[in-house]
Amino acid sequence: MNFINSLSAHLSDWVLRLASVCLAALGLVVIYGVVMRYAFNDAPPYVEQVALLLVISVAMFGAASGVHDAGHIGLDSAVKLLPAKGQFWCLVVVEILTITFAAVLLYGCEHMAASTRHDTIPTLGISEAWRYVPPMIAGVLIILFSVKHMLALFTKKTPA
């Protein structure tokens, strides 16, 4: 279990840093686009598409890191009223639902990437499939982090 905790902590740290870099790049790209449009009346055509890819990356990588830290939104007021065994099984159901969501996300993005891999984003000259890479990476990480949480639940260890 220590190996899994260590691996997931490193992956979460890595993906959070990647999200931070994407967020900083997003800010720079948007500022560049605004300055070019309004100060020089010469809007670069690629800014919107780069910004879209960066927004997707920030959201997906941030979500994966949030799942690792158990920082996702939880409405647990009613769950806290349950006995310990009921709380345990509610947590298990949450992890199962999270894994299911991530698996569907991964499957859907893989399908969309495969069906759009020959299409090109005109202003960037890259495949449309690249739009689906960050959600696929996030899907794999969310599954890994949720499995780690479930293992911790069943072995009575607090996830790191």
What are these regions (language model features)?
Residues 1-160:
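Alpha-helical transmembrane segments and membrane-interface helix-loop junctions
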